[in-house]
């Protein structure tokens, strides 16, 4: 069953552009992982201060395999000057997925 994992990242005021830059530089670090379907980095606009990294996976097993291997390796040695002050992981199963046609009236 497809799953969605959302990393809610707490970012201090003014540090958002640096977080976005770091994600842009590493956007391809996960794309070839088995079971990875895609991700979006969401910038807060109103009513929320956290950034959300929304990832889509074929299964929880695929996510766990990435999180316990390549994700750890990708972050090794990158602890200097962290941008985030905290993060929490939200986990969901996809029970309905409706795609749009992209057409306008």
Curated annotation (Swiss-Prot):
Family matches, as Pfam families: ABM
Cysteines paired by S-S bonds: none
Chain positions of site Transition state stabilizer: 66
Entry EC number(s): 1.14.99.57
Keywords: Heme, Iron, Metal-binding, Monooxygenase, Oxidoreductase
GO molecular function, one term: heme binding
Domain ABM intervals: 3-92
Family of this protein: Belongs to the antibiotic biosynthesis monooxygenase family.
Function in brief: Catalyzes the oxidative degradation of the heme macrocyclic porphyrin ring in the presence of a suitable electron donor such as ascorbate or NADPH--cytochrome P450 reductase, with subsequent release of free iron.
Xref: PROSITE patterns: ABM
UniProt key word Nucleotidyltransferase: no
Record InterPro entries: ABM_dom, Dimeric_a/b-barrel, Heme-degrading_MO
Domain of life: Bacteria
Miscellaneous section: MhuD has the ability to bind 2 heme molecules per monomer but only the monoheme-protein complex is active.
Any one of the GO BP annotations: heme catabolic process
Complexes and interactors: Homodimer.
One cellular component (GO) term of this entry: plasma membrane
Identification of the protein by name: Heme oxygenase (mycobilin-producing)
Binding, heme: 22-26, 75, 83-86
Catalytic activity, reaction form: heme b + 3 AH2 + 3 O2 + 2 H(+) = mycobilin a + Fe(2+) + 3 A + 3 H2O; heme b + 3 AH2 + 3 O2 + 2 H(+) = mycobilin b + Fe(2+) + 3 A + 3 H2O
Keyword Membrane carried by entry: no
Gene name, Swiss-Prot/TrEMBL: mhuD
């Amino acid at each position: 069953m497809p799953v969605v994992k959302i990393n809610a990242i707490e970012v201090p005021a003014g540090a958002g552009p640096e977080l976005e830059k770091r994600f842009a530089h590493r956007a391809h670090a996960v794309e070839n992982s088995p079971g990875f379907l895609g991700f979006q980095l969401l910038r807060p606009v109103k009513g929320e201060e956290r950034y959300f990294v929304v990832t889509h996976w074929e299964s929880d097993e695929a996510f766990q395999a990435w999180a316990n291997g390549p994700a750890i390796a990708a972050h090794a040695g990158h602890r200097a000057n962290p941008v985030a002050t905290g993060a929490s992981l939200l986990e969901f199963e996809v029970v309905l997925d409706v795609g749009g046609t992209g057409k306008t009236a």
